[in-house]
């Protein structure tokens, strides 16, 4: 993935809103853009085969 563990932490340690796909802080409970309550953790693995 990323070259450095620091970069990987910064890029992948996020939550994604299930409604508007906004990136949120890992400690967020609601979306910062739309206020939606359902957030998922960003995938650590790429979707490609």
Curated annotation (Swiss-Prot):
It comes from the Archaea. InterPro entries: Ribosomal_eL40_arc (IPR023657), Ribosomal_eL40_dom (IPR001975), Ribosomal_eL40_sf (IPR038587), Ribosomal_zn-bd (IPR011332). One of its GO terms (biological process) is translation. GO terms for molecular function: structural constituent of ribosome. Keywords: Ribonucleoprotein, Ribosomal protein. One of its GO terms (cellular component) is ribonucleoprotein complex. PANTHER family: 50S RIBOSOMAL PROTEIN L40E, LARGE RIBOSOMAL SUBUNIT PROTEIN EL40. HAMAP family: Ribosomal_eL40 (MF_00788). This is Large ribosomal subunit protein eL40. It comes from Methanosarcina acetivorans (strain ATCC 35395 / DSM 2834 / JCM 12185 / C2A).
